[in-house]
From Swiss-Prot:
InterPro entries (alphabetical): V_ATPase_D
Keywords for this protein: ATP synthesis, Cell membrane, Hydrogen ion transport, Ion transport, Membrane, Transport
Record's protein name: A-type ATP synthase subunit D
Organism: Halorubrum lacusprofundi (strain ATCC 49239 / DSM 5036 / JCM 8891 / ACAM 34)
Keyword Membrane: yes
Annotated Basic and acidic residues bias: 205-214
Lineage of the species this protein comes from: Archaea, Methanobacteriati, Methanobacteriota, Stenosarchaea group, Halobacteria
GO biological process assignments: proton motive force-driven plasma membrane ATP synthesis
Amino acid sequence: MAKDVKPTRKNLMAIEDRIDLSERGHDTLEQKRDGLIMEFMDILDQAQDVRSDVSENYETAQRKIDMARAMEGDVAVRGAAAALKEHPEITTQSKNIMGVVVPQIESSKVKKSLDERGYGLLGSSARIDEAADAYEELLEKVILAAEVETAMKKMLTEIETTKRRVNALEFTLLPRLYENQEYIEQKLEEQEREEIFRLKKIKAKKEEEEKAEAAAEAAAVEDPEPAD
């Protein structure tokens, strides 16, 4: 509460410094929040596109694998899958978006040639190749979706954190500082008025005393004591 603050000029200067710092911090955080929201909206648009792509690629891959099973049989499809020589490699790096560290997923060996798939020309068919192509494309989209979704969650968390800090400054700290500032200013003004009034009383009393002394001196001059 404001009454807990000692009304001194030193405290007033300290509070004014805190207000200045808090206002600048509030403005900076507001700019950061607005920038984060803009970045988040861009990522959200990208996430929606990626989700749509994943859904479409999944349906295509399912259709292709169902066709391969129907035409070539489960044994041939499983044999082609078991012949895979190299699995995809995924590495994770990071990038900074307005102070938020988000993942950047790099993948390799997702799209493969017939040799890399392991079953070769003789062990393959057009249906199995199409299914393999479809699932490789689906995997690429899933990897991208993981990157975008993680970035979106991290950005959203940072936005909420920044919002809370902005609100704490705007609705809690700054109002309390303004209240303390106003309280001290009022008390200092009261003290100043009281001091002026006290000095005026002292001055008036001194003037009265000086007048009395002057009157006494004048009376003594006009009515000197008789000589012996």
